[in-house]
Regions:
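Beta1/beta-strand and adjacent pyrophosphate-binding region of the FAD-binding site
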Residues: 1-10
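N-terminal Rossmann-fold NAD(P) dinucleotide-binding loop
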Residues: 13
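Gly/Ala-rich phosphate-binding loop of Rossmann-like dinucleotide-binding domains
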Residues: 17, 21
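Glycine-rich FAD pyrophosphate-binding loop
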Residues: 22-42
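An anion/pyrophosphate-binding glycine-rich loop and adjacent beta-alpha core
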Residues: 36-38, 43-44, 52, 56-59
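Short beta-strand to alpha-helix junction loop
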Residues: 74-81, 102-115
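Single conserved hydrophobic/aromatic residue that forms the stacking wall/gate
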Residues: 117-126
């Protein structure tokens, strides 16, 4: 029996599971994915470099990227936004860089770095 089921084994699903585990380490969490592999897009995102987030730090600017849900996203983005995502990787020794167009990538230009940090079962009980 699980306390939390996360539907979708992509980057957002794994990140949500990790954040839930950080908030409550005793949670039993399962990630359900209907595809053949989990985190498949992470390995190819940004031409194999893994676009981690976008450097929109102003919440209004950030919500403009989501025209169908910008009002609904203001609340969640007040709780967890771009800076939090970047801090997650940097606190785990994944230095990031911001490109001219605002995309944020690992300085290593390697998606396996991001992939590894999203799938550390010894740290996160997922």
């Amino acid at each position: 029996m699980y306390d939390l089921l996360i539907i979708g084994g992509g980057a957002a699903g794994f990140y949500a599971a990790i954040q839930a585990n950080i908030e409550n380490p005793k949670l039993k969490i399962a990630i359900l994915e209907r595809g053949k592999t989990v985190l498949g897009k992470v390995k190819v995102s940004g031409g194999g470099r893994c676009n981690v987030t976008h450097a929109a730090f102003d919440l209004i600017t950030l919500t403009e990227n989501y025209p169908r849900g910008k009002k609904e996203l203001l609340g969640p983005f007040h709780s967890h936004s771009t800076g939090d995502v970047m801090a997650f990787f940097e606190e785990r020794d994944v230095p990031l860089k911001i490109e001219l167009d605002g995309r944020v990538f690992p300085k290593s230009n390697s998606s396996p770095v991001s992939y590894t940090h999203l799938t550390l079962p010894t740290i996160y009980s997922v």
